[in-house]
């Protein structure tokens, strides 16, 4: 495949560093405070780290209080209606902080902002919002913010710039435990329910040398867990035109010396390969964890979703993956109540879940996204009926998860301690190599470290144990 993406020229990126310096000088007498609120997926988390990096280069400090913030950035998600409603609710609340501080600059970015109808709604109904820009304009954030300050006008930048990759942006990563590394952007799959290809553009792969250098630096800086991000990591490299694929990238990353784990998300079954599973099985650093969204256990529904695989293909993939990785932790996504789905078809999905026995399942009732083919499909089944199917699915999966977790009681697992808990009995949280949540004993000295945890109890959602 001919490569369609281009790197943003270094001169244009340097221009953004100049705007950062100008903004820092502009506010030298009183450095501004910024708040970045992130909605949605890990790709948005990674994008917010770049936004924070640029804000810090402008001289900003950070706050969690909107009333104290001079710059507020909402990095939004367009995948589901619930996330959009939360964003609009937050925008409404910001009218009060803007009245109290008229100089406050409010920015809306991310996938919602890329949708023309959202940008127009904000333009007309949320006039206190100063800056709106989509994911493809993230690298121009300093210039856009400079325009807001110097031209004293609202700025909208949602142009279609699907072919651009920006390297070398400043970044702020919290702590030294986990890091997110984008290896590609966009999606070519056009699942009929999904808005992502319309707001994040077509697939563009970063050069492998850039990714390897970034991961090597993170390991040298002491990061313990690095997650490789892409809407479909299994199609990484197709646009490079070299034959170098995701399995090759994992092979090269695994050569980096250090005490760390590599994870990745998300995967598309149509592009998953035996080669990838063989590389995972043989690697020293790649977690034996696979998130492989199935979405439905009914072939007809999969076709309606424009998911180009069938149930037999999916089962073949996971059978092979489990054969070469007996300790594999397998998770998935399922949508219940897709337009036109019948109860018997929904129960095919439940039957698949019973057969596969996923370690965990992320389940959703269909949420129509304006601008997608599925939003125009006839959907005669009432929400109450879909909820009944959904509850049945969740009950089955919860039983499976509880049973699988119970098998770990009495074992000692190596875990990365990554957070603190409000529960005095279990003051720390950790993750196993397979990504299972563990609540455990310990103190702050354990944060960011690998520890052996003796599992003493479990429930549907987590394990519990003591650090040995």
Regions found by a protein language model. Give the residues of each.
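Conserved SAM/AdoMet-binding glycine-rich loop
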Residues: 106-108, 115-117, 220-348, 354
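Radical SAM enzyme [4Fe-4S]-AdoMet core and its adjacent flexible, acidic
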Residues: 41, 237-258, 305-308, 368-399
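Short flexible coil/turn linkers enriched for glycine and charged/polar residues
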Residues: 174-177, 187-189, 286, 296, ...
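Terminal RNA-binding accessory module
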Residues: 1, 19, 376-468
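Generic beta-strand/beta-sheet core signal
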Residues: 37-39, 196, 229-231, 265-267, ...
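Conserved, mostly hydrophobic/aromatic
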Residues: 191, 211, 228, 264, ...
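Proteins enriched for Cys/Gly/acidic motifs involved in redox and nucleic-acid/cofactor modification
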Residues: 1-236, 275, 290, 312-323, ...
């Amino acid at each position: 495949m001919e490569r369609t993406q281009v790197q943003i020229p270094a001169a244009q990126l340097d221009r953004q560093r100049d705007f950062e310096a100008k903004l820092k000088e502009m506010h030298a007498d009183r450095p501004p405070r910024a708040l970045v609120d992130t909605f949605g997926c890990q790709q948005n988390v990674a994008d917010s780290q770049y936004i924070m990096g640029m804000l810090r280069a402008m001289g900003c400090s950070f706050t969690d209080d909107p009333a104290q913030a001079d710059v507020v950035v909402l990095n939004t998600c367009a995948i589901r209606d619930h996330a959009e409603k939360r964003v609009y609710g937050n925008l409404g609340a910001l009218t009060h902080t803007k009245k109290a501080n008229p100089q406050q600059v409010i920015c809306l970015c991310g996938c919602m902002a890329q949708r023309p109808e959202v940008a127009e709604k904000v333009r007309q109904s949320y006039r206190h919002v100063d800056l709106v820009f989509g994911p493809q304009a993230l690298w121009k954030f300093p210039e856009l913010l400079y325009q807001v300050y110097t031209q004293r006008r609202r700025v909208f930048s949602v142009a279609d710039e699907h072919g651009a990759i920006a390297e070398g942006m400043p970044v702020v990563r919290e702590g030294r435990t986990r890091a997110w590394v984008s290896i590609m952007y966009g999606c070519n799959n056009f699942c009929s329910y999904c808005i992502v290809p319309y707001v994040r553009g077509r697939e563009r792969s970063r050069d492998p040398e850039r990714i390897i250098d970034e991961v090597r630096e993170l390991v040298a800086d002491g990061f313990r867990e690095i997650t490789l991000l892409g809407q479909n990591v299994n199609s990484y490299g197709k646009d490079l035109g070299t034959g170098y694929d995701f399995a090759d990238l994992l092979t090269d990353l695994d050569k980096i010396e250090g005490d760390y784990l590599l994870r990745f998300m998300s995967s598309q079954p149509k592009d998953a390969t035996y080669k990838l599973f063989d590389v995972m099985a043989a690697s020293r650093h790649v977690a034996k964890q696979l998130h492989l969204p199935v979405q439905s256990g009914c072939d007809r529904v999969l076709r309606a979703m424009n998911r180009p695989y069938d149930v037999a293909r999916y089962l073949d993939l996971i059978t092979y993956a489990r054969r070469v990785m007996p300790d594999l932790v397998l998770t998935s996504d399922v949508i219940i109540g897709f337009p036109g789905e019948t109860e018997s078809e929904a129960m095919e999905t439940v039957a698949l879940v019973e057969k596969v026995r996923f370690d965990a399942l992320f389940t959703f009732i269909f949420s129509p996204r304006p601008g997608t083919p599925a939003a125009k499909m006839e959907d005669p089944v009432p929400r109450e009926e879909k909820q009944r199917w959904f509850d049945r699915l969740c009950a089955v999966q919860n039983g499976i998860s509880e049973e699988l977790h119970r098998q770990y009681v009495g074992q000692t697992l190596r875990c990365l301690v990554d957070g603190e808990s409000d529960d005095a009995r279990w003051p720390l949280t950790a993750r196993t190599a397979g990504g299972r949540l563990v609540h455990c004993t310990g103190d702050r000295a354990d944060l960011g470290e690998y520890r052996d945890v003796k599992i003493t109890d479990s429930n549907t959602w987590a394990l519990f144990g003591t650090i040995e």
